[in-house]
A protein has these predicted regions:
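Beta-sandwich strand segments
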Residues: 1-6, 60-62, 126-138
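Low-complexity, acidic Ser/Thr/Pro/Gly-rich terminal tails and inter-domain linkers that flank the onset
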Residues: 10-41
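Short beta-strand and strand-turn-strand segments in soluble, beta-rich domains
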Residues: 30-31, 73-91
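Internal, hydrophobic beta-strand segments that form the core of beta-sheet-rich folds
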Residues: 50, 116-127
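Asparagine-centered strand-capping/turn motif at beta-strand->loop junctions
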Residues: 52-56
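Short coil-to-beta strand junction motifs in C2/discoidin
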Residues: 62-69
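Short proline/glycine- and polar residue-rich coil/turn motifs
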Residues: 90-101
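Short, surface-exposed loop/turn segments at beta-strand-coil junctions that are enriched for proline
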Residues: 106-114
Length: 151
């Protein structure tokens, strides 16, 4: 004899867009400006200006499930990811091929003091990081994280 068990299964469906749009090669950019200070305090949320150019032949969408956003990774001195999923910074509007955009990146600093590499990257949400499609498309800068001055 067996016991009948009832449970609910849920699923979410997200429309990502038309196949042609999803296949568009948006994964090309040029970092034009924005450099963090060489030292930051641990466990902080900081803002930093950045400028990027869309060097692809497709428009970067600023909205929708597969929007393009700027982000970052924190790496250790050996280049291994310590924090891979950095905060996203939304584009203020769609960026046409050849267009540039200036925005404020929001960056959460690591909790643990030490020497890190801050790697700036971009991603197309739900699909891919630019660095996964175009290795070498990131900018890496050394940053020392000092102990927090919180009491």
């Amino acid at each position: 004899e067996f016991e009948e068990v009832t449970f609910l299964v849920g699923a979410a469906v997200t429309y990502l867009g038309e196949a042609g749009d999803l296949d568009a090669d948006v994964y090309q950019l040029e970092w034009l400006g924005g450099k963090p200070p060489s030292e930051w305090r641990a466990n902080r949320l900081v803002r930093m200006p950045a400028t990027v150019r869309n060097t692809s032949s497709a428009t970067w969408p600023a909205r929708g499930a597969t929007r393009v956003a700027l982000a970052y990774h924190w790496l250790d001195a050996a280049g291994q990811a310590v924090i891979f999923e950095g905060l996203r910074s939304a584009l203020p509007a769609d960026v046409a091929p050849g267009g540039t955009v200036e925005l404020q990146l929001e960056i959460a600093t690591p909790r643990k003091p030490g020497d890190y590499i801050l790697e700036f990257d971009a991603l197309r949400e739900q699909l891919a990081w630019f660095s996964g499609k175009r290795p070498g498309s990131t900018v890496r800068l050394p940053v020392t994280i000092l102990p927090s001055d919180d009491r």
